[in-house]
């Protein structure tokens, strides 16, 4: 079967699924709630907010030292900052931060994507939220930590790599800062690792729906030299969602040829 025939076959399956959503079986063991997942571990430090999936830790600094603010070269100086950092995950954390700034009086002042994934093919993340009141910043980090149980839902991995999809009907300031996504419009993020899988996913997404390319990153151009290809798209919410789902299906199929069936650790939300 040629690659075009494979794409056509998967797109037909995706369109059928979108038109007639499948009934998902109720799992025997309910997954932990976002509240439980955020509070898996704790400590007595006032700066500590919580932990979450992806070796993620949330911290706050109520009154940042001015010398550190100068050295960090943040776009805006805030007295209080929130820190969302992880060994594994970039898209889930950016999407979670996007929800955090929608829900709180905070702003994303820095997003960095270190080469990490604990030796895997992708990124970790370091996201800084700023605010004039430490209670606002802490609340923003709390929201982001809770959102990670949702935003990790469409991350699928096996021993060979991973694929990741993110979708929102209304992009906010974190997606705008990270990728240049138009604020207020639907946005999708499509990631494939190894990068070869990501390139095919990107092509499939663009062929499956009428969407606009916002950004494209590859190992030597914008991914901190991770073995990933990343496509960010915008457009009508239905079209963006269809494009993301099409990319997910072909990505799972190809990644599965390199190892075991790719699995997600949280329920899919797209």
Curated annotation (Swiss-Prot):
Residues 47-152, 154-262 form the BMC circularly permuted domain. It comes from Citrobacter freundii. One of its GO terms (cellular component) is bacterial microcompartment. Has 2 BMC domains which can evolve independently of each other. In purified BMCs seen as a 30.0 kDa and 25.0 kDa form; the smaller form is called PduB'. Homotrimerizes to form a pseudohexamer with a central pore. The trimers pack into an array. Both forms interact with shell protein PduA. The lineage of its organism: Bacteria, Pseudomonadati, Pseudomonadota, Gammaproteobacteria, Enterobacterales. InterPro entries: BMC_CP, BMC_dom, CcmK-like_sf, EutL_PduB, PduB. It comes from the Bacteria. Pathway: Polyol metabolism; 1,2-propanediol degradation. It is found in: Bacterial microcompartment. One of its GO terms (molecular function) is structural molecule activity. The two proteins produced are among the major shell proteins of the bacterial microcompartment (BMC) shell dedicated to 1,2-propanediol (1,2-PD) degradation. Overexpression of the gene gives large amorphous intracellular structures; when only PduB is overexpressed large circular bodies are observed which contain concentric rings, whereas with PduB' overexpression internal bodies with regular straight-lined structures were generated. The N-terminus of the long form (PduB) is required for correct formation of BMCs. May play a major role in binding the enzyme contents to the shell. Belongs to the EutL/PduB family. One of its GO terms (biological process) is propanediol catabolic process. This is Bacterial microcompartment shell protein PduB. Pfam families: BMC. Gene3D superfamilies: 3.30.70.1710. NCBIfam families: microcomp_PduB, PRK15415.1. Keywords: Bacterial microcompartment. Artificial BMCs can be made in E.coli by expressing pduA-pduB/B'-pduJ-pduK-pduN-pduU-pduT (in this order); pduT and pduU are optional, while pduA, pduB/B', pduJ, pduK and pduN are essential. A construct with the reversed gene order does not make BMCs. Ethanogenic BMCs can be made in E.coli by targeting pyruvate decarboxylase (pdc) and alcohol dehydrogenase (adh) to them. PduP(1-18)-Pdc and PduD(1-18)-Adh strains targeted to the BMC (PduA, PduB, PduJ, PduK, PduN, PduU) make significantly more ethanol than strains where Pdc and Adh are not targeted to the BMC. CDD domains: BMC_PduB_repeat1, BMC_PduB_repeat2.
């Amino acid at each position: 079967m040629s690659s075009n025939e494979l794409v056509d076959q998967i797109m037909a399956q995706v369109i059928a699924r979108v038109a007639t959503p499948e009934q998902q079986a109720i799992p025997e063991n309910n997954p932990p709630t976002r509240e439980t997942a955020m509070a898996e571990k704790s400590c007595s430090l006032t700066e500590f907010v919580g932990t979450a999936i992806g070796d993620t830790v949330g911290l706050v600094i109520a009154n940042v030292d001015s010398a550190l603010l100068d050295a960090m070269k943040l776009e805006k100086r805030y007295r209080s900052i929130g820190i969302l950092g992880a060994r594994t995950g970039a898209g889930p954390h950016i999407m979670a931060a996007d929800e955090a700034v929608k829900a709180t009086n905070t702003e994303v002042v820095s997003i960095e994507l270190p080469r990490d994934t604990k030796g895997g093919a992708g990124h970790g993340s370091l996201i800084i939220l700023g605010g004039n009141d430490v209670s606002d910043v802490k609340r923003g980090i709390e929201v982001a930590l809770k959102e990670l149980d949702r935003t990790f839902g469409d991350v699928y991995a096996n021993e060979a790599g991973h694929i990741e999809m993110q979708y929102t009907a209304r992009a906010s300031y974190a997606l705008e800062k990270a990728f240049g996504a138009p604020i207020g419009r639907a946005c999708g993020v499509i990631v494939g690792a190894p990068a070869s899988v990501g390139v095919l996913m990107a092509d499939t997404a663009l062929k499956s729906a009428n969407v606009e390319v916002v950004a494209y990153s590859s190992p030597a151009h914008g991914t901190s030299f991770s073995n990933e290809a990343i496509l960010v798209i915008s457009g009508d919410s239905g079209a963006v969602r269809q494009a993301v789902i099409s990319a997910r299906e072909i990505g799972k199929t190809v990644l599965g040829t390199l190892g075991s069936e790719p699995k997600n650790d949280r329920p899919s939300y797209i």
